[in-house]
Amino acid sequence: MLVFYALLFVTVFSNTVMGATIDKPIPKPILREAIEEIEVNKRADSHYCKEENCPPGKHCPEVPIACVYGPCCF
């Protein structure tokens, strides 16, 4: 009886956990959102351009750049 439960557990575990991670790739929108969040976090570092420091009508560049003097908005 114990062997039966062990086999059942291994079968269910392998089908749910391993199957979910191997057979189903990460959806592209979720992956894209994660990459955008990482880029936003890079821009939020203290030495990078911050959007809230920019005057009205100016924005930080797409590529995060280090600002030595001023908010470096374009």
Curated annotation (Swiss-Prot):
Residues 20-41 form a propeptide. Contains 3 disulfide bonds. The keyword Chloroplast does not apply. GO terms for molecular function: potassium channel regulator activity; toxin activity. Residues 1-19 form the signal peptide. Keywords: Cleavage on pair of basic residues, Disulfide bond, Ion channel impairing toxin, Neurotoxin, Potassium channel impairing toxin, Secreted, Signal, Toxin, Voltage-gated potassium channel impairing toxin. One of its GO terms (cellular component) is extracellular region. Expressed by the venom gland. Its main location: secreted. It is found in: Secreted. Inhibits voltage-gated potassium channels. Belongs to the scoloptoxin-07 family. This is Kappa-scoloptoxin(07)-Ssm2d. It comes from Scolopendra mutilans. The lineage of its organism: Eukaryota, Metazoa, Ecdysozoa, Arthropoda, Myriapoda.
